[in-house]
């Protein structure tokens, strides 16, 4: 029978069918090989957009720098980065005029944060450029290495544990004539294996001291390492993203704290909120524009797209914004906040791994590291790569490219949103002084513009004025990729608005399925995803029921735990059948032990163990959840865990799910092969941190643990805490006198050891 596919949509409103056109099923594309080419593209493009600016040379590093600020006003529609300082400052002034006290209050909030933030804030985040080893590392390790090097160079302000004091060290480190660092290297040697008598290669890890002069250190401190952005759907070309080092991160964090605080107070800002809260906020702006456009006015909405947002933004402009926003604040605060944009004006982009060459005979492969691109003969490269290298050569220093203009992806999302909103804010009638007026929504580089006017000419004039105003601050609305509609239908940050936001369900598709953490977590995450989508994304009861059945099927195939009475043969079926036969109450078996599925859409909020507890045989209960059973993982004490789920766009989201510790919540062991590589030292460091932090948490259960604002080390804090707790326990009779004396003695010993050290 032939089915005409359009028949499927007869009963579906057009806006609900939008989901079906999204490229969100299946695996997203990943990048392979080196990101060097993409990074060179970014650097070259950024310079092209600002090419009419002024060239200068950085006196400290010798890097050539291009400054497009207050450059020529554009005469065509090509994207450009020539922001005008006075225009940006005026936009800020108007923003403050229409939101009295907004900057003042945000500064006060930020000042409090600056004084209280601990340096461990920087351990959050994934890969970070580690300047000591000149490559990426997990954030915690990169921070540890930085602090270790600082201490060995006599910079010790960071020992207070406050982020602001760590940043003092960073500032001082930049004035030092030289910095001594410890680098890791590998030695390979051939030795004869005693057992097999064969020759084997033995690797040993060495650490060696190395001195960096001021120039080399500054280049590293200002370096952003680059990688290729993975898993981007709906694009043919990959693009580069940057990861900054520890020197820059802390300063950026404070700037973004200030900008976040401002964004929270701006009704047009799509950041920092998300999800349903964001939808409600945005729907308000639309409602305002629609109710104000009485019968006499037309209202149109542009679904906006900006050309190369990051590459046309300029850190110097951000410096001007910060200078204005903080103008009545204490000097120290203004200084702390202006350092991030200054560092970004002098940033260097690391070109990544370099290029891989293969000989025609495919017998030889060789890596050309980025450092060699400045001097290598270009005859080995194809045309497009040759052009890239020729263009970037004047900018190269030690394998990094000087990149003064532009912002790199995702660094100042909040602050750039403030800039965008300040232009939307200029659309009020009292500022446009004509019949048209505008408002809109801004979230990083994404925007929606709502224009109201008495007639079509007015709408056109309003759009033109908005377009030109944006050009003055380095924002380039793309005329090709933006489109206009009667207000009531538009798209913003992948939310589709059609007289209210429509659920774009396809975006959630990638997060359905089995996560692959362990049997316990996967079951919990799977049902939580379905539950959340019923709440937030119009997942109807029938579809949810079907999703649940598909999930259980998927789960059983993943963990080979088909029901005990099934005919399917897997390598687990023998054990599971045996368990099935000797279990009296078969309904009590977990799905992962071959039991039946008791979930339906009404009880998705209950962890499976709790759902089946009353139905379980006693000895099964005893095995499953017995803390004395060595297979029961009790790593997590809280009852709520966090899983990382991948929505189709945007960063991975953290999602809470209920965690019940059972024999099924195992933690896979680390791959052993890492222990033979140069990463081994890092791993040991990481485990040491883990142990220290776990110990610290034992002393300060989260309920009583307020972040210390004073200055004391972790050890001192734990010792004083132990003394207080011991005294309370002794006085209330929970511990004996001897135990109390022993605890006090241990505490004194620890303090004595610290003094000797």
From Swiss-Prot:
PROSITE patterns: RDRP_SSRNA_NEG_SEG. Residues 286-483 form the RdRp catalytic domain. It holds the Pfam family Flu_PB1. The keyword Metal-binding does not apply. A motif (Nuclear localization signal) lies at residues 187-195, 203-216. It catalyses: RNA(n) + a ribonucleoside 5'-triphosphate = RNA(n+1) + diphosphate. It is found in: Host nucleus; Host cytoplasm. It is an enzyme of class 2 (transferase). Residues 249-256 are annotated as: Promoter-binding site. Residues 50-82 are annotated as: Disordered. GO terms for biological process: DNA-templated transcription; symbiont-mediated suppression of host gene expression; symbiont-mediated suppression of host mRNA transcription via inhibition of RNA polymerase II activity; viral RNA genome replication; viral transcription. Disulfide bonds: none annotated. Keywords: Eukaryotic host gene expression shutoff by virus, Eukaryotic host transcription shutoff by virus, Host cytoplasm, Host gene expression shutoff by virus, Host nucleus, Host-virus interaction, Inhibition of host RNA polymerase II by virus, Nucleotide-binding, Nucleotidyltransferase, Phosphoprotein, RNA-directed RNA polymerase, Transferase, Viral RNA replication, Viral transcription. Its EC number is 2.7.7.48. Phosphorylated by host PRKCA. GO terms for cellular component: host cell cytoplasm; host cell nucleus. InterPro entries: RNA-dir_pol_NSvirus, RNA_pol_PB1_influenza. Belongs to the influenza viruses polymerase PB1 family. RNA-dependent RNA polymerase which is responsible for replication and transcription of virus RNA segments. The transcription of viral mRNAs occurs by a unique mechanism called cap-snatching. 5' methylated caps of cellular mRNAs are cleaved after 10-13 nucleotides by PA. In turn, these short capped RNAs are used as primers by PB1 for transcription of viral mRNAs. During virus replication, PB1 initiates RNA synthesis and copy vRNA into complementary RNA (cRNA) which in turn serves as a template for the production of more vRNAs. Influenza RNA polymerase is composed of three subunits: PB1, PB2 and PA. Interacts (via N-terminus) with PA (via C-terminus). Interacts (via C-terminus) with PB2 (via N-terminus); this interaction is essential for transcription initiation. This is RNA-directed RNA polymerase catalytic subunit. It comes from Influenza A virus (strain A/Turkey/Ontario/7732/1966 H5N9). The gene is PB1.
């Amino acid at each position: 029978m032939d089915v005409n596919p359009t028949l499927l949509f007869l009963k579906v409103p057009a806006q609900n069918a939008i989901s079906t056109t999204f490229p969100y099923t299946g695996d997203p594309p990943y990048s392979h090989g080196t990101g060097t080419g993409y990074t060179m593209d970014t650097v070259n493009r950024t310079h092209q957009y600002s090419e009419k600016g002024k060239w200068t040379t950085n006196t400290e590093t010798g890097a050539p720098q291009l400054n497009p600020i207050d450059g020529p006003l554009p005469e065509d529609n090509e994207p450009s980065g020539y922001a005008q300082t006075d225009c940006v400052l005026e936009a800020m002034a108007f923003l403050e005029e229409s939101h009295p006290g907004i900057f003042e209050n945000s500064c006060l909030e930020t000042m409090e944060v600056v004084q209280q933030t601990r340096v461990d804030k920087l351990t959050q985040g994934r890969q970070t450029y580690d300047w000591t080893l000149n490559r990426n590392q997990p954030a915690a390790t990169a921070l540890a290495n930085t602090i270790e090097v600082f201490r060995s160079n006599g910079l010790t302000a960071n020992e207070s544990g406050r982020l602001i004091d760590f940043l003092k060290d960073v500032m001082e480190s930049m004035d030092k004539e030289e910095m001594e660092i410890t680098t890791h290297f590998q030695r390979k040697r051939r030795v004869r294996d005693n057992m097999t008598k064969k020759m084997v290669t033995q690797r040993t890890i060495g650490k060696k001291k190395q001195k960096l002069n001021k120039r080399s250190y500054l280049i590293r401190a200002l370096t952003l390492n680059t990688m290729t952005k993975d898993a981007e759907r709906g694009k043919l070309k990959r693009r580069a993203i940057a990861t900054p080092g520890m020197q820059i991160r802390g300063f950026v964090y404070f700037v973004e704290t200030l900008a976040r605080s401002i964004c929270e107070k701006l009704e047009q800002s799509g950041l920092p909120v998300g999800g349903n809260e964001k939808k409600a906020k945005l729907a308000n702006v639309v409602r305002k524009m629609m109710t104000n456009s009485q019968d006499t006015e037309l209202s149109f909405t542009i679904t906006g797209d900006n050309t190369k947002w990051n590459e046309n933004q300029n850190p110097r402009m951000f410096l001007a914004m910060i200078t204005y926003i903080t103008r009545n604040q204490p000097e120290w605060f203004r200084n702390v906040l202006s350092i991030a944009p200054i560092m970004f004006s002098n940033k260097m982009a690391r070109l990544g791994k370099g290029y891989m060459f293969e000989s025609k005979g495919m017998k030889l492969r060789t890596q050309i590291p980025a450092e060699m691109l400045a001097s290598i003969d270009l005859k080995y490269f194809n045309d497009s790569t040759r052009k890239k290298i020729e263009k970037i050569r004047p900018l190269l220093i030690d394998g990094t490219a000087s990149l003064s203009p532009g912002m790199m992806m995702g660094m100042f999302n909040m602050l750039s949103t403030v800039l965008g909103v300040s232009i939307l804010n200029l659309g009020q009638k009292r500022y446009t002084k004509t019949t048209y007026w505008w408002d809109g929504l801004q979230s990083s580089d994404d925007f929606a513009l709502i224009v109201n006017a008495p007639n079509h000419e007015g709408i056109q004039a309003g759009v033109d004025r908005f377009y030109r105003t944006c050009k003055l601050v380095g924002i380039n609305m793309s005329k090709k990729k933006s489109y206009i509609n009667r207000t009531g239908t538009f798209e913003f940050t992948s939310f589709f608005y059609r007289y209210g936001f429509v659920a774009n369900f396809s975006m959630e598709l990638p997060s359905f399925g089995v996560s692959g953490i362990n049997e316990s977590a996967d079951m919990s995450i799977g049902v939580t995803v379905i539950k959340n989508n019923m709440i937030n994304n119009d997942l109807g009861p029938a579809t949810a029921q079907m999703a649940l059945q598909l999930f259980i099927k998927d789960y059983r195939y993943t963990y080979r735990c088909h029901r005990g009475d099934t005919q399917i043969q897997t390598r687990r079926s023998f054990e599971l059948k045996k368990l099935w036969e000797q279990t009296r109450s078969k309904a009590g078996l977990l799905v992962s032990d071959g039991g039946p599925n008791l979930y339906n859409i009404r009880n998705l909020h209950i962890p499976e163990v709790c759902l089946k507890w009353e139905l379980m045989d006693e000895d099964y209960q005893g095995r499953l959840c017995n803390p004395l059973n060595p297979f029961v993982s009790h790593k997590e004490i809280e009852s709520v865990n966090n899983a990382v789920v991948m929505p189709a766009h945007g960063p991975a989201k953290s999602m809470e799910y209920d965690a019940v510790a059972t024999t099924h919540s195992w933690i896979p062991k680390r791959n052993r092969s890492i222990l033979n590589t140069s990463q081994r030292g890092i791993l040991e460091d990481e485990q040491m941190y883990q142990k220290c932090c776990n110990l610290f948490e034992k002393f300060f259960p989260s309920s009583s643990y307020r972040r210390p604002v004073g200055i004391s080390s972790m050890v001192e804090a734990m010792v004083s805490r132990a003394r207080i707790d011991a005294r309370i326990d002794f006085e209330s009779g929970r511990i004996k006198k001897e135990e109390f004396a022993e605890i006090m003695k241990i505490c004194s010993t620890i303090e004595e050891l610290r003094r000797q050290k």
